[in-house]
Amino acid sequence: MIESRFIDLGSVPPEYGSAVDAIIFDEVSEGRSPATLHVYSRDRSTISLGRFRDPDIDVKRDVLESAGVSVIRRVSGGSTIFTGTSQIIYSVTMEDIFPSKKDSYQRICDCIVTALGSLGIEAGYKPPNDVLADGKKISGSAQYRAKGFLLQHGTVIVEPEPLIDEILSPVKNRGYPGTVSIYECLGRTVPRNIVVDAIMESFISKLGLDLEDGMLSDREHDSVRLRSESFKV
């Protein structure tokens, strides 16, 4: 088992969540914090740009302001995504113990597959970094790797997100035949705490994390406060 902590941040501003992802990676990779699984939701609809994405290509800026959508840049690579307030974002930061990048994606995404299975949803891993249910994307992930450590974070779609086609440029809504939510798979709403518990239990059983309830350290809090604004676009 891997000594680690679990943090549920609840609903937070988009830039705060992105800063926490980055700061936790810094602290874990420097040995000041244990391996960490943390989850959060965003307090407003958000466009999350991959590390190298161009917002002028991916985003319909003319509709952002009227829709009340924030834009942030995350520490990981990958495509531009839309996240609504109902989605749950997971982020795991740990030593890179995996034989390959492909294996790390598969094993961590399998945790999400297991979590969804415990809720009654038949899902499967789609390489390199997606989880599908009913042939549609229900979770997508991205990674950041450095200094022998990795951060993998991703979304779990809990409720339908009708704004996605209005906000993202059509060319970027591809690669899978649409998205699906937990609600659409089950025909009912699943409380957030139930989904979070399922995610936590799957990381214990599938990845061997010995999770203890925790919180951000004082150093992490201070760093997040200082750096949050830098993640806005």
Task: Give the ranges of each region predicted by the language model.
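Structural motif
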Residues: 133-134
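N-terminal lobe of the biotin/lipoate ligase/transferase fold
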Residues: 1-103
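A generic structural signal for well-ordered coil/turn residues at beta-strand boundaries
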Residues: 3, 43, 84, 127, ...
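Long, positively charged amphipathic alpha-helical accessory segments at protein N-termini or as interdomain linkers
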Residues: 23, 99, 106-123, 137-233
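Short loop/edge segments at beta-strand edges and connector loops
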Residues: 73, 125-127
